[in-house]
């Protein structure tokens, strides 16, 4: 099969492949970029594989950087822009995977087949030369046509080599709307316990992409049916089933925070921040998700809660409430937000220093208490956010304390 037209990303990289070819070596576009071209999807990364060894690539191109030379990868700087920087990796075979994630060592080879047969799934094992000729050694085109995910060679071996491939399969089911071939799924289920060997950070990335996929329901269903959920920190299959059955069928998550919050609203006896600490996410992400889960429990928005959580989070929460079938006033959050004089305490027209100068106050608990009270009154519209009004109010507060 030959592509009728190369995508712009391949056209831009064409001279690199041609130059390698001129020196007597093979070079191909490989991996997900070729798959995405065949699916008519946007390309994110252009991966190039070659029969040339790393030192030979460095002899061909004047500007290179060793980014993973021990694994055969050299970054070729073909132009000034980052878009013209290409990672070029030598065809290779791999030894056993002691850690179930990375090979203990790699051997460079000249044979394309040897390189492609170590890849995870047939639809990721294509090669494409600089003229657009597709090389399909494992019947990936048939799988692509059938939207089917099949492991290259022995599925058990592929998942033994890299257990993260189990999560990748589920992610592809979600993002590409692929079904899993029977033997491949059976191997996923049989090897799901190996996910305990994989870092939670890597699993989180795959699970997060799964949740944001157009067919996230497929991915979550596979997570349950493969029993892989058992090997994810503090996961509950009942919560996953509730999300699948209780969330409206056409709902798609706006962002990662909303997706994880949706899951966690269905968990029982959950400490959100403690749960997310086990997933080693950032404090910022953890706080955002915890806020969404807390806000989900509110019956209605008022000035104080809207100010505390902010309109962005309020709208994300309202989307979840509606998707889970709760009857809410869809316009209330925006209406309440419009009634707020401030949306952050930095918008208060007077700062602590102003009060210190005006009333000879010193830094400390008393000043902090006054500032907090002023903020609360402005939020509740009990006090105008105006300098004279605030100074008058503070004066009253100080006189009452005498």
From Swiss-Prot:
InterPro entries: Bact_CCA-adding_enz_type3_sf, CCA-adding_enz_C, CCA-adding_enz_firmicutes, NT_sf, PolA_pol_head_dom, PolyA_RNA-bd. One of its GO terms (molecular function) is magnesium ion binding. One of its GO terms (biological process) is tRNA 3'-terminal CCA addition. Its cofactor is Mg(2+). It catalyses: a tRNA precursor + 2 CTP + ATP = a tRNA with a 3' CCA end + 3 diphosphate; a tRNA with a 3' CCA end + 2 CTP + ATP = a tRNA with a 3' CCACCA end + 3 diphosphate. The keyword Cell membrane does not apply. It is an enzyme of class 2 (transferase). Its EC number is 2.7.7.72. CTP binds at residues 32, 35, 119, 162, 165, 168, 171. Mg(2+) binds at residues 45, 47. Gene3D superfamilies: 1.10.110.30, 1.10.246.80, 1.20.58.560, Beta Polymerase, domain 2. ATP binds at residues 32, 35, 119, 162, 165, 168, 171. It comes from the Bacteria. PANTHER family: CCA TRNA NUCLEOTIDYLTRANSFERASE 1, MITOCHONDRIAL. Belongs to the tRNA nucleotidyltransferase/poly(A) polymerase family. Bacterial CCA-adding enzyme type 3 subfamily. Homodimer. Catalyzes the addition and repair of the essential 3'-terminal CCA sequence in tRNAs without using a nucleic acid template. Adds these three nucleotides in the order of C, C, and A to the tRNA nucleotide-73, using CTP and ATP as substrates and producing inorganic pyrophosphate. tRNA 3'-terminal CCA addition is required both for tRNA processing and repair. Also involved in tRNA surveillance by mediating tandem CCA addition to generate a CCACCA at the 3' terminus of unstable tRNAs. While stable tRNAs receive only 3'-terminal CCA, unstable tRNAs are marked with CCACCA and rapidly degraded. A single active site specifically recognizes both ATP and CTP and is responsible for their addition. This is CCA-adding enzyme. It comes from Lactococcus lactis subsp. cremoris (strain MG1363).
